[in-house]
Amino acid sequence: MTTSTSEQTAGTHAGPASQDVLRDLYADWSAIMAATPDLGIRLLRSLFDEWHQPTVEPQGVTYREDTVGGVPSIWCLPEGADKSKVLLYTHGGGFAVGSAASHRKLAGHVARAVGAVSFVLDYRRAPEFQHPAQVEDGVAAFDALVASGIAPQDITTIGDSAGGNLAIAIALSLKAQGRPGPGSVVAFSPWLDMENKGETLVTNNDTDALITPELLEGMIAGVLGDTVDPKAPLANPLYADFTGFPRLYVTAGSVESLLDNSTRLVERARAAGVDVTLSIGEGQQHVYPFLAGRSAIVAEEFDKLATWYRN
């Protein structure tokens, strides 16, 4: 298989104010979690449902709640979008927090940029439901979209952070079953390493406003429990076989602690012959596309993503 790769580093810097919105939100969350170590899951979810705040409402996008494949979801429907092209979006939040509502605006921006529709899943969350429930919900939604008449190759699995993990795992699960999978996969700042390793967990610890090894350890315990191997490929795609995997677009912020989750993923996928694009946002935080509508870097990123998607 021929390997086609490109690596791009965003060269336009957003103004300080636009960048501070996301960094400051993360800093506020970190301060609250540090001051309230026994914060319950209900309050933690309420906190992370504010994730949409840095994102400007996308123009010309309407929303519709639905249930597909038994999974509650929100459709993001840009004016003039090709409804035969679907972005199956899995939200981030350590598999435990975040929701379709917290990611609605971000998914709407991406759909508008590429000219498709987005379908944001409210998959079952940990700790009430452990791995592989989240992957199963993603596959069920994928199957239902195909059953409705959407061609598998016209579906893109896409997600951020833990949702980026799921976007990859859904495609891996379908491939392992010998079934047609998505035509492409997109991962924003994917969180993949369930062993909680990585050089940038240390080197970017002082620049990442949200992610810490301790925070990740708690999320890992919630989703894997005592029974799931942290090296299981559908839980930790860094151990997956990427032979025959769809083309892949990955973004990460240069100052985030999970940066080398992305770079290790790209290395592994490239070694298997996957067509990979890696885009690193200089000076950007975890899931910096949340700055959509207020950041020149994100506008440039979405232009690159749209070109990649259409080609």
Report the location of each language-model feature.
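Catalytic active-site module of serine/aspartate enzymes centered on a nucleophile-bearing elbow/loop
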Residues: 293-311
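Catalytic nucleophile-loop/oxyanion-hole region of alpha/beta-hydrolase
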Residues: 99-100, 106, 119-154, 292-298
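A glycine/proline-hinged amphipathic helix-loop "lid/cap" segment
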Residues: 1-81, 310-311
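Short beta-strand element of the alpha/beta-hydrolase
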Residues: 84-93
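Hydrolase active-site cap/lid region
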Residues: 172-228, 244
